[in-house]
A protein has these predicted regions:
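Short, charged low-complexity linear motifs
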Residues: 1-4, 141-142
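N-terminal secretory signal peptides and thylakoid transit peptides that target proteins
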Residues: 3-32
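Onset of an N-terminal alpha helix
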Residues: 12-15, 39-46
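Bacterial Sec-dependent signal peptides at the C-terminal "C-region" and cleavage site
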Residues: 30-40
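Mature-region segments of soluble proteins
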Residues: 44-51, 60-63, 67-172
Length: 172
């Protein structure tokens, strides 16, 4: 392998890139007191959470959860923000376990709403919901080139036209 190919390979498959790419699919261990209750991933919980916080997204064709993969690979998203989202997923699931003895993703929609109402009364929960909803609106209102605002559905829903000039390639 020539040096140029070797350098490209090492940049592409570095430990840092591997860890960044796997952030939302990494395991989150859920505890019930001192006992291990189960395991989930941030992306699995975020997919359900997005439906609960913005039920119209699916009907509109706005796919918000995969957008999180793109965003969390961007170097401008701080490690602290990433960790807060991951911890928020853990805390959300642990609240569901405390209230209903089940992880958040396995609850009925009405029970998930009860969990959301409960955590919204806490400082961390209010901040977590705010952060998740910020990313959801970013996905819904972003340029379709990023893959979440399919067919400009979010724009059409709000009777909005995107900014000009439109990007020719994704910048994330």
């Amino acid at each position: 392998m020539n040096q140029r190919k070797k350098d490209l390979f090492l940049r592409t498959f570095s430990r840092r890139n591997f860890l960044k790419a796997g952030f939302l699919s990494s395991a989150v261990f859920l505890m019930d007191g001192c006992n291990l209750f189960g395991v989930t991933t941030p992306i699995d919980t975020i997919k359900v959470l997005h439906v609960d916080l913005f039920p119209k997204a699916k009907q509109l064709g706005v796919i918000t959860a995969p957008y999180m993969h793109i965003v969390f690979q961007h170097p401008r998203i701080s490690t602290q923000d990433k960790e807060f989202i991951k911890n928020g997923v853990k805390w959300l699931n642990e609240e569901a376990i405390k209230m209903f003895h089940s992880s958040y993703t396995k609850l009925s929609p009405s029970k998930r709403q009860e969990v959301l109402k409960a955590i919204s009364q806490t400082k961390w929960g209010d901040s977590f919901i705010y952060n998740i909803m910020s990313y959801m609106f970013e996905a819904m209102l972003g340029d379709p080139i990023y893959g979440s605002n399919n067919h400009e559905a979010g724009w059409k829903w709000l009777h909005f036209s995107g900014g000009e000039p439109r990007p020719k390639k994704a910048f994330l």
